Amino acid sequence: MQKILDTLYQGKNINQKQSEALLHSIIKEKLSAIQIASALISMKIRGETFEEIIGAVNILLTHAKPFPRPNSLFADITGTGGDNSNTINISTTSAIVAATCGAKIIKHGNRSISSLTGSMDLLKQHCLILNSPQQARKNFDELGICFLYAPQYYTVLHRIMPIRKQLKIPTLFNIVGPLINPSKPPLTLIGVYKKELLSPIIRILQLLKYNHAIVVHCGGIDEVGLHSPTHIAELHNSIINNYILTASDFGLDSYPIEILRCYSRKQAREYMINILKGRGKPAHSAVIAANVALLLKLFGYTDLRANAQLALEKIHYGIPYTLLSSLSETKIQNHATHNTR
């Protein structure tokens, strides 16, 4: 293991097998916090490679807590985080809206590490991140959506969280997070914090045999955006295509990114709730509609403009907030039942 660490410290790449060995040592608690931090920083400085990423993904997937995988078609929508944009939480809000549009969603996420707020920071306030795998699956069967809190399925992620929080930078674990959903979805929409990650991530999704996957980056954020062209890498039937989308492709207006900024977790939550209730700012609702539109493409709905309008219609009537309330009520009811046993 020291040889692998020395290679990293010298600014050199490690191969897939070495990456697997490194992750295995981290999982088995054979490395100190300083060694882990040093390895992560070494990769971050020169840029994580395809082999380093796939090696980490392979090992982590073999150590996931089992999840009762549905037989039906379902998707994840997630991002690497780490873009330091401090925008509203787009992927979580989009997941809820997409579910009201008929998409089946199993969203995998984490607490904030290097960003202002993570998907699970928002959902924690609605008691939605501590579901057992069985309860999460029940929510999926009944409501068409559920949320999987990454550290519940990967104990190593819980152990290294303090290290990542102290580093306050995106690392290898930001990159692999969207690739290790324990439900192993056949469809996924992934945002990456830098354009250079589009190619390695879509190639890894190809190796993992996803049916249909889209990876996006837009002007510094790991989402579909309306402030700048969105760069796309799409995998469908084992074929990869690259292209660019703009706001007009969704039938939406452009907005400056500054309108999406938020400056506290409280504000992030308020923005999300307002969007779901149909009371959000037009720019907020529009960017959610764009992300939902592309997500629906994974399910075969190829008209992005029609998809965006469907999302805006659901938002206008507050239907996504009703779904969020149903998820919260389900959690509370199950908690009460558990306590009376």
Curated annotation (Swiss-Prot):
Name the record gives this protein: Anthranilate phosphoribosyltransferase
Summary of the function given for this chain in its UniProt record: Catalyzes the transfer of the phosphoribosyl group of 5-phosphorylribose-1-pyrophosphate (PRPP) to anthranilate to yield N-(5'-phosphoribosyl)-anthranilate (PRA).
Protein's gene: trpD
Binding site for 5-phospho-alpha-D-ribose 1-diphosphate: 79, 82-83, 87, 89-92, 107-115, 119
Record-listed Mg(2+) 2 binding positions: 222-223
Superkingdom of origin: Bacteria
Cofactor: Mg(2+)
Gene Ontology cellular-component annotations: cytosol
Free-text remark on how the cofactor is bound: Binds 2 magnesium ions per monomer.
UniProt: Mg(2+) 1 binding residues: 91, 223
GO biological process: L-tryptophan biosynthetic process
